[in-house]
A protein has these predicted regions:
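C-terminal module of multi-pass small-molecule transporters
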Residues: 2-3
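Amphipathic alpha-helical packing segments from all-alpha helical-bundle domains
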Residues: 6-30, 34-41, 81-93
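C-terminal peripheral helix-coil segments that are non-catalytic and often amphipathic
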Residues: 31, 56-139
């Protein structure tokens, strides 16, 4: 489902209602229609991209004959950690030295962090847009 949402314009009833609601919230928050359209587009892409990645993991889990998501993700993280620790440190010092930080948080924490980062950026850009002269604004 997430894959189908990529590179398409929402035309289904549910997608249209969700888009209308989100777009309305952004406009009511004081964004210009153009700015709100860009923000909504980026938020939607973030959500759909995350859903698509999750669907890829579920497919891999099933293909591996696993039923427990925790077991799958622990094995997935072990595989990444083992690979990064085998990299030549002189070529990849940051990945090698910080592999535990790179793999520390689970999908939910990463999703929440990314969403907050995106929302904070939209809020900051909107606040900055309000202080720019009309020619510098997204119209």
């Amino acid at each position: 489902m997430a894959r189908a949402a990529l590179a398409s314009i929402p035309t289904g009833e549910h997608s249209l209602r969700t888009g209308e609601f989100t777009y309305g919230l952004l406009i009511e928050a004081g964004m210009s229609p153009r700015e709100a359209s860009l923000a909504m587009d980026r938020l939607t892409l973030y959500l759909v991209g995350d859903a698509y990645e999750a669907s890829v993991h579920w497919a891999r889990m099933r293909a591996a004959g696993m039923r427990d998501p925790r077991e799958y993700f622990e094995a997935f993280i072990r595989q990444i950690t083992t690979y990064y620790r085998a990299l030549p440190r002189e070529r990849f010092p940051h990945l090698y030295d910080h592999v535990d930080d790179l793999t520390a948080d689970g999908g939910e924490a990463r999703f929440e962090y990314g969403l907050e980062l995106l929302l904070d950026g939209i809020e900051a850009a909107h606040a900055q847009d309000l202080t720019r002269p009309a020619l510098g604004r997204i119209a």
